[in-house]
Regions:
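A short, structured beta-strand/loop element
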Residues: 1-41
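Long, charge-rich, low-complexity alpha-helical segments
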Residues: 25-75
């Protein structure tokens, strides 16, 4: 999955947070919903500007970020 095709960061959109290209839906909103157990189909209903590919791109983006640094869990 090439998430760069679907995700953009623009300082003038959503305070510079990562968003799905062509929308104002932040990647964090998608990830928060998935983490809360919301099914992708429900996310697509709630945010009709999204696609399945956009949801997969958000997950791929998060996976790349997770590989970039270690977050100490003992702190």
């Amino acid at each position: 999955m090439e998430w760069k095709e679907h995700i953009t960061v623009d300082p003038n959109v959503c305070h510079g947070k990562a968003c799905i290209r062509g929308t104002r839906v932040m990647v964090s909103v998608i990830l928060d919903n998935l983490a809360a157990g919301v099914e992708p189909e429900e996310i697509l209903r709630d945010y009709p500007s999204l696609t399945r590919e956009a949801i997969r791109a958000a997950i791929a983006y998060a996976a790349d970020l997770a590989g970039e640094r270690v977050v100490p869990l003992w702190a």
